[in-house]
């Protein structure tokens, strides 16, 4: 595997890119090849996939509490990516004067759905 397999370790998007997942550290997990592609891995086992997604959602909900609002700069800083990276993904997210409710931030980072 190109750049995804170092000593048998695979980087896995918890919310798959095909599901609207983005590239930020919390959405990435390192798994062995067996953990990644085996029968108990997230690609073959829906329960394991949901377990990882719910864990990520919980972490994001702590970073972005539902009743608070956040601007793109804060979102970018908390997730360790550039403002420009997130601006394009948050264009259609409901906001008031550039302030995004925590629930909407988490929902977008989870690919548009909650688990």
Q: Where do the protein language model's features map onto the residues?
A:
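Short cysteine-rich loop/turn motifs with clustered Cys
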Residues: 1-10, 32-35
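Short Cys/His-centered divalent metal-binding micro-motifs
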Residues: 28-51
């Amino acid at each position: 595997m190109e750049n995804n397999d170092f000593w048998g370790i695979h980087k896995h998007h918890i919310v798959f890119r095909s599901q609207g997942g983005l590239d930020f550290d919390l959405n990435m997990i390192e798994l062995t090849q067996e953990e990644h592609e085996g029968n108990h891995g997230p690609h073959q086992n829906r329960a394991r996939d949901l377990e990882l997604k719910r864990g990520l959602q919980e972490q994001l909900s702590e970073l972005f509490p539902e009743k608070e609002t956040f601007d793109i700069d804060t979102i970018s800083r908390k997730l360790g990516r550039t403002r420009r990276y997130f601006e394009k993904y948050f264009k259609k997210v409901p906001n008031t004067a550039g302030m995004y409710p925590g629930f909407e931030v988490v929902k977008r980072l989870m690919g548009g759905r909650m688990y």
